[in-house]
Design a protein with these regions (language model features):
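Generic structural signal for well-ordered secondary structure
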Residues: 14-18, 54, 140
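Metal-dependent phosphoesterase signature
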Residues: 53-87
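A structural signal for alpha-helix termini and helix-coil/disorder junctions
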Residues: 27, 46, 50-51, 67, ...
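Alpha-helix termini
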Residues: 20-23, 27, 63, 115, ...
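Active-site neighborhood of HAD-like aspartate-dependent phosphohydrolases
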Residues: 1-49
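Short, compositionally biased "basic patch" segments
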Residues: 36-63, 113-121
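C-terminal cap/substrate-recognition subdomain and adjoining C-terminal extension
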Residues: 1-3, 73, 77-189
C-alpha cells in the first residue's frame, strides 16, 4: 500500500505539542505545578548530567498526568490548537494513504489525527493515567522498527520531517521525495 509518511511536531503541527499540552493543562489545572521538581529532575538528569535515559526523562515530564484526565484534556487541547496544523497537511485530499509516526504520546495526538483523517498513527505508547511509556519512546531508529512491525504492508512515497538528523532513519524509507519542513515551509532534501 502506498503512503506518505509524516513526523508530527514541527512538521505537520507548527510547534511542540508536548510542551504546549503541558501549558494548556497547567492553565486549566494549576495544581500540576507540584510536579515541576520531578520534571526538572528528568530534564536535568538527561540533558545536563546524562544520567537518565530519554525515555525516563519523558516519563518524569509527563508525571503530571496522574492528576488529570489526560484523554479528555487532549480532546479539549485540540479544539483550541487544531488551527496550528500546517495548512498543506490535509490527509483527506491525498491520493495515497497518510501515516504519522511520532515520538509524541498516542493519546496526545490521536484526537487531531483522527479528526483530520490520518490513516495510521504510530507514536509513543504512554499510559495516559500514569505517564509511563509502554515499550520504547518512538524516536529515531525505534520509528523504523515500529513502522516495519505495524506498517509492514506500506511503501512510503514521500517522507516529511523537521529534523533530518534525528529522523534520518525514516527518511531512508522514502521511495520518491525526502521533504524538510522549516517554519511550516516544505523543501526537498
Amino acid at each position: 500500500m502506498l503512503a506518505d509518511l509524516y513526523d508530527f511536531d514541527k512538521t505537520v503541527f507548527d510547534g511542540e505539542s508536548g510542551s504546549e499540552f503541558w501549558l494548556f493543562c497547567l492553565k486549566r489545572h494549576p495544581s500540576i505545578i507540584r510536579f515541576l521538581p520531578k520534571q526538572a529532575a528528568g530534564l536535568f538528569g538527561h540533558y545536563v548530567f546524562r544520567k537518565i535515559s530519554k525515555k525516563r526523562s519523558k516519563e518524569l515530564f509527563y508525571s503530571y498526568l496522574k492528576a488529570i484526565d489526560a484523554e479528555k484534556e487532549a480532546e479539549l487541547f485540540w479544539e483550541e490548537k487544531a488551527d496550528k496544523m500546517n495548512d498543506w497537511f490535509n490527509p483527506r485530499e491525498h491520493d495515497v494513504k497518510t501515516v504519522v509516526c511520532s515520538a509524541s504520546p498516542v493519546f496526545q495526538i490521536k484526537p487531531v489525527c483522527d479528526k483530520l483523517g490520518v490513516d495510521l498513527l504510530i507514536a509513543t505508547r504512554m499510559n495516559p493515567s500514569t505517564g509511563l511509556i509502554e515499550g520504547e519512546n518512538c524516536k529515531s531508529t525505534e520509528k523504523v522498527f515500529r513502522l516495519k512491525k505495524e506498517a509492514a504492508d506500506y511503501e512510503f512515497r514521500d517522507v516529511y520531517t523537521d529534523n533530518p538528523v534525528s529522523d534520518g532513519p525514516i527518511l531512508e524509507l522514502a521511495t520518491r521525495k525526502k521533504i524538510h519542513i522549516q517554519g511550516g515551509k516544505r523543501s526537498e532534501i
